[in-house]
Each structure stands twice: as structure tokens, then as C-alpha cells.
UniProtKB/Swiss-Prot annotation:
The active site is at H206. Keywords: Chloroplast, Plastid, Purine biosynthesis, Transferase, Transit peptide. The keyword Transferase applies. This is Phosphoribosylglycinamide formyltransferase, chloroplastic. It is found in: Plastid, Chloroplast. Pathway: Purine metabolism; IMP biosynthesis via de novo pathway; N(2)-formyl-N(1)-(5-phospho-D-ribosyl)glycinamide from N(1)-(5-phospho-D-ribosyl)glycinamide (10-formyl THF route): step 1/1. N(1)-(5-phospho-beta-D-ribosyl)glycinamide binds at G109, S110, N111, E276. Gene3D superfamilies: Formyl transferase, N-terminal domain (3.40.50.170). (6R)-10-formyltetrahydrofolate binds at K162, L187, K188, L189, I190, N204, D247. It comes from Vigna unguiculata (Cowpea). Belongs to the GART family. It catalyses: N(1)-(5-phospho-beta-D-ribosyl)glycinamide + (6R)-10-formyltetrahydrofolate = N(2)-formyl-N(1)-(5-phospho-beta-D-ribosyl)glycinamide + (6S)-5,6,7,8-tetrahydrofolate + H(+). CDD domains: FMT_core_GART. The record marks D247 as: Raises pKa of active site His.
């Protein structure tokens, strides 16, 4: 079978290349990590060199967040005698393991709650395994304890002797086998030790359309007051990768919210927060499904679940 020929080129060992069922049936395979196209030169051409009527790859997508993996979509080309309606698609897809998430909060943690609820309902292919906070009695920490999620105090403070140092925090998150770090209203600057340990795996949500109204001092209601005072007609949440500075990492997703003529900061904040809850869950779903891809110019994109050639 042509599909078996393709898979055997990825998985030369018989244990990694199981028998594939009828091509009209969907199938899922575990592939070894593919770190670059150069590892598999035959992938550099869309036509894999099989004769007419064989399977030809039509899409290759490199996943660059945490563990590298590939998804391959194949279609059976028609011979000169084949009827068009006999064409069909075959999809060989990497099996994605369930991800482990660490969430950082400083307050009530409404975004944290939305993510946790999505995980419990099954719409999110990951679990919040640990909560990190700089305020041990904040609402987010209380919610975590009530739901059996371990709570870690960071950073270490004079009045909080149980707090961790940056290196201790990195070691602790590694013990929890954390895949992604999600900042959800966490007001402390993330230490460089953590950024280096979890490269391209730390995300933050900010209540404005970055790069506008971001940076040190722009948080909470201060952001919405500044947006209204500026006369801006639109605002909305931004989710971005975290670097060594406040709100300067690569933008991953945004959602536009109109600023109404007579808006108060509280009214605008409520509408933006509603969009935050939806957007963060959608982005974390994409992270857990390994649907983040990188453009050649370094811009991250979220791949559509339904169509790998479309981006959200």
C-alpha cells in the first residue's frame, strides 16, 4: 500500500511503522521527533517520488513549541483513467500527548478558572498541574486549593518565608513536568532563569491591543482608563510570548473590542475580560494541540484545527 511506503520512510523500524488500514479510514501514528527538514531530505519536495496514483504529500507543518513534531496530510492523485469522485484524502497525524500547565496569578484568577474549567470539560487537551502566586491568600490561590491544585509561592518575600527563589522555581516546575507557563494576571516580572528554562513556552494575557498601552505600570484598570483617555476607538486582549521585559514578547493572538462613546473604565474592562476568557482558552487549546507555527520572519501563528493551511 502506498501509505505504508510513505510511513516506512519516516519509521524504518517495523515497530514504529504499524500496518495501515484501508486508506478511506482515518489513522493515527506515533512518529519519532523530526527536528528539521534536513533530517529527511525527501520531504523537501512536495512530490515524494511515487508513481501516478500513489500518495503525494500536500502539506508539511513543523511544530516548534517545546517538543518538535510533524503533521502530514496526503491525498491520492488521480490517474488518467480514474474518476474524480474516487479521490480521497489520507491523514497521518502525530498523536499529541496531554500537556501539563502551570498558571501564575496575583488576584482572583478568572482567566485561570476559565482554563481549568475548559480542561475539566474536556475541550482542552491539558491539565493545570500547579498554580504559582505572589499572594498566598488571593482568590486564584484559594480556588486552586479548593480544586486540589498545588499552590507555590513566588517570589520569596520577607513576610513569606515559604517563597521560592528563581532557580528553585525552575526546579519545581520541572518536577511537575510543566510544558507551558500561563500568566493570568500575574503582576511580577518573570525572572530570566525561568524564561531561559521554558523558551517559547511562557505566555501572558494583557488587557489592551499591544504594543499600545503596555509595559511597566500598565495593568488592571490603569490600562482601560488610559485607553479611554487617549480617544482610542478599539481595545481588546492580547496574548503574547513572554520575554525579559513587560509586554514586549511576540504577539500570538488578539481580539478587538470597541470602545463606546460613553464608556467608563469599568464597563470597558468588563467587555475586554469577557473576551479574555474566550481567547485564552482558545489559545491554550492550540498550544496543547501543538498548532503554533512560526513564519520565516519569526512571527508566531495559530493554525486552524480544521484546515492546516488557514490561521486564526
Amino acid at each position: 500500500m502506498e501509505a505504508q511506503q510513505i510511513i516506512s520512510r519516516f519509521c524504518p523500524k517495523s515497530s514504529l511503522a504499524p500496518s495501515i488500514p484501508m486508506v478511506k479510514q482515518p489513522f493515527s501514528l506515533n512518529f519519532p521527533p523530526l527536528h528539521s527538514l534536513s533530517s529527511y531530505p525527501f520531504l523537501q519536495s512536495q512530490n515524494l517520488g511515487f508513481p501516478t496514483g500513489a500518495l503525494h504529500a500536500i502539506s508539511f507543518v513543523h511544530k516548534e513549541v517545546c517538543s518538535s513534531s510533524w503533521r502530514i496530510w496526503c491525498s491520492k492523485s488521480s490517474s488518467s483513467t480514474a474518476e474524480p469522485e474516487e479521490d480521497h484524502e489520507v491523514r497521518a497525524q502525530v498523536t499529541v500527548r496531554r500537556k501539563k500547565l502551570a498558571v501564575f496569578v496575583s488576584g482572583g484568577g478568572s482567566n485561570f478558572r476559565s482554563i481549568h474549567e475548559a480542561s475539566k470539560k474536556g475541550s482542552l487537551h491539558g491539565d493545570v498541574t500547579v498554580l504559582v502566586t505572589n499572594k498566598s491568600e488571593c482568590g486564584g490561590a484559594q480556588y486552586a486549593r479548593n480544586n486540589g491544585i498545588p499552590v507555590i509561592l513566588f517570589p520569596k518575600a520577607k513576610d513569606e518565608p515559604k517563597g521560592l527563589s528563581p532557580c528553585d522555581l525552575v526546579d519545581t516546575l520541572r518536577k511537575f513536568e510543566v510544558d507551558f507557563v500561563l500568566l493570568a494576571g500575574y503582576l511580577k516580572l518573570i525572572p530570566v532563569e525561568l524564561i531561559r528554562a521554558f523558551e517559547r513556552s511562557i505566555f501572558n494575557i494583557h488587557p489592551s491591543l499591544l504594543p499600545a498601552f503596555g509595559g511597566k505600570g500598565y495593568y488592571g484598570m490603569k490600562v482601560h482608563k488610559a485607553v479611554i483617555a487617549s480617544g482610542a476607538r478599539f481595545s481588546g486582549p492580547t496574548i503574547h510570548f513572554v520575554d525579559e521585559h513587560y509586554d514586549t514578547g511576540r504577539i500570538l493572538a488578539q481580539r478587538v473590542v470597541p470602545v463606546l462613546a460613553n464608556d467608563t473604565a469599568e464597563e470597558l474592562a468588563a467587555r475586554v475580560l469577557n473576551e479574555e476568557h474566550q481567547l485564552y482558552v482558545e489559545v491554550v487549546e492550540a498550544l496543547c494541540e501543538e498548532r503554533i507555527v512560526w513564519r520565516k520572519d519569526g512571527v508566531p501563528l495559530i493554525q486552524s484545527r480544521e484546515n492546516p493551511n488557514e490561521f486564526l
